[in-house]
Each structure stands twice: as C-alpha cells, then as structure tokens.
Amino acid sequence: SYRHLLPEQHVLTADVLKAIDYETLALLAGLFLVIRGIERAGIIDDLSHIITGMGGGNLFLTYTIIVWASVLISAFVDNIPYTDTMLPVVGGVATALGVDQTVLCFGLLVGATLGGNLTPVGASANIAACGILRREGYEVSAGQFMRIGVPFTLAAVLTGYVLVWLFYAGL
C-alpha cells in the first residue's frame, strides 16, 4: 500500500481553493484563447508567407528571423501558446523552402523558451512566480525583473542560436 507516502494531516479542499492564484490562471487562459482566435482567423498561413518572403529562400536567414522574432514575441506573449501557434507556421515555412523543419523548429524553441525570460509576463513560470511573490508581500517591477532577464536571455539565446545552427550544419 502507498498509504505511508501520504501526509499525516488532511488538506481541506477549501484551503486548496484559497491557495490558487486565480488572477494568473485567468491571464493564462485568456492568452490561450487569443492565440486560438488568431489561428482560426487564418493568420497562421499569412505568417508563414511573410516569414518565407522575409527569408528570401535562404535557410540561415529564415532560421535567424524565427529565432529573434520568437525572442521578442515571447517576451510579451506566454511561450506555451506562442509555440503552439507557431509550430504550424514553421511547418509551412519549411514546406515552402523545401527543407526539413527540424532546424527551424529548434530555432523556434530556442527563441520562444529563452525569450520568455526577458520580462515577467514572458513565461508561465515568471507569471506564477511574480504572483506568488506579490501574495507574499514582495513586489518585483518589470524593470527589476529585466535587469536580470535581459543579459541572461541574450547570453542564453546567442549560445543556443549558434549551437543549434552548428549542429544542424554538421560542424
């Protein structure tokens, strides 16, 4: 029996419901809804064509655009719905270029997952952590967050950007 692994004290449902950060939960739910609306409006196909056009048929330039656009967008849009939305865009770009989508997908992942560290609203973990800090009486301003987030993000993205391309290119 696994009963010995359970805590001795009982947790009341009411206590659990009080501990939930509903503001953060509502923000994340809203983000997912907006992204779904964008997808249904046909903007995904439009974005594929725009990115393909900007890259001019050059895979490295297209990869670069995807990475750095993802960094900037993920700084303000949660990276989970952004990545979910952009995966079909990247697939469309790869198809238009006639290439395997692997390097472009990894570029998306580098930009989106690391770009979310630029701002307090760029990643679910940042939103949740700031909500927890606020609930405990500590306010973290966007400026305070970004003084650490910007240099960390730039160093991490540059490293990932170069390494993904080098591994893809077979060096």
Predicted feature descriptions by range:
Residues 35, 119, 163-165:
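C-terminal TM-helix exit segments that contain a strictly Trp-centered aromatic cap at the helix terminus
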